[in-house]
C-alpha cells in the first residue's frame, strides 16, 4: 500500500505500546488480597484459590467476548465474577468496592511502556493524527485514561477507543467503522498497528484499513490466512515506514 496517503495511525495498546512485566504477578497478588479482605468485610468467606479462579474466569470471558467482537461494561464483569463465586448479594456499594479494588491494583502495579514508545508517538504526531484502539479487560476506562496520562502518552492521541466503553471490540468491523466516521477519512487513509493477527490485522483489513503487524514472536500462523501490509519486529521500526 501507499503510505503517502495515510492521515491517521491507529495503535493497539497491549503488547504494542505497553507490556506486562513482573508487575503482573504483583498485581494479581494485590487483587486477591484486596478482594479477600473485601469479601470478609461483607461476610463472604472466599479462599484465595477461588478468588484467583474467578479472576481467571473473567479474563477468559473477556478474551472470548473480544474475539466475538463485543465487550461489556465493568459493572457487568463484576456481576459475572460474583455469579462465578456464587455470591448472591445485590449490593451496589459492594460491587463498586470490588471494582475500585481491582482498579487500584492496576494503578499500584501497572504495565510497563516500551522504552521507545513516547519518542515514536511524538515524532508521528507531528505529521499524522493518532488514535488508540484497544480491547480492554476488567479495568475501568477512566483508570486506563489515568494510567495513560501517568506514563505520558494520553495526550499523544486525538481519540481513544476502549472496548469496554464502546461495547464493541476488535476484530469487529464496528469499532473500526467508528474510527472511520469520527475522523471522516477514507479507509486507505488510515493504518492500524497491532500485535494480534486476528483482532488487529484481520479486524482492520475488514474495514479497508492498512495494517502493520508487530511480530515480536517472529512467527505468523499461516492457518489464519491473514496477511498484513507490513510486518515489523517491534514499534522501534515504525518510523522507517512513515517518516
Q: Which sequence ranges carry the predicted segments?
A:
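Asp-based, Mg2+/Mn2+-dependent phosphohydrolase catalytic module
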Residues: 1-9, 19-21, 26, 42-49, ...
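N-terminal helical cap/lid subdomain that shapes the substrate entry/recognition surface
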Residues: 3-115, 119
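Glycine-rich phosphate/diphosphate-binding loops that line cofactor/substrate pockets in enzymes
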Residues: 14, 124-125
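Residue-level signal for short amphipathic helical patches enriched in basic/charged
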Residues: 112, 127, 139
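Glycine-centered short loops/turns at secondary-structure junctions
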Residues: 127-128, 208
Amino acid at each position: 500500500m501507499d503510505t503517502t496517503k495515510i492521515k491517521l495511525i491507529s495503535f493497539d495498546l497491549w503488547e504494542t505500546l505497553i507490556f506486562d512485566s513482573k508487575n503482573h504477578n504483583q498485581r494479581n497478588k494485590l487483587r486477591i488480597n484486596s478482594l479477600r479482605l473485601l469479601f470478609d468485610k461483607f461476610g463472604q468467606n472466599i479462599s484465595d484459590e477461588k478468588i484467583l479462579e474467578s479472576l481467571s474466569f473473567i479474563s477468559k470471558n473477556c478474551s472470548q467476548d473480544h474475539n466475538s467482537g463485543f465487550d461489556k461494561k465493568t459493572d457487568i464483569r463484576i456481576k459475572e465474577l460474583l455469579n462465578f463465586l456464587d455470591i448472591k448479594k445485590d449490593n451496589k456499594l459492594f460491587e463498586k468496592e470490588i471494582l475500585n479494588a481491582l482498579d487500584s491494583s492496576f494503578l499500584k502495579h501497572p504495565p510497563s511502556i516500551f522504552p521507545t514508545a513516547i519518542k515514536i508517538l511524538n515524532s508521528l504526531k507531528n505529521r499524522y493524527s493518532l488514535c488508540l484502539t484497544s480491547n480492554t479487560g476488567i479495568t475501568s476506562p477512566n483508570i486506563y485514561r489515568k494510567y495513560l496520562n501517568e506514563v505520558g502518552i494520553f495526550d499523544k492521541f486525538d481519540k481513544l477507543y476502549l472496548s469496554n466503553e464502546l461495547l464493541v471490540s476488535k476484530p469487529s468491523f464496528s469499532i473500526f467503522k467508528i474510527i472511520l466516521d469520527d475522523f471522516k477519512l477514507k479507509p486507505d487513509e488510515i493504518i492500524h498497528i497491532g500485535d494480534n493477527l486476528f483482532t488487529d490485522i484481520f479486524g482492520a483489513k475488514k474495514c479497508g484499513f492498512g495494517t502493520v503487524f508487530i511480530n515480536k514472536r517472529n512467527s505468523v500462523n499461516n492457518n489464519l490466512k491473514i496477511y498484513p501490509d507490513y510486518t515489523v519486529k517491534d514499534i522501534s521500526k515504525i518510523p522507517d515506514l512513515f517518516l
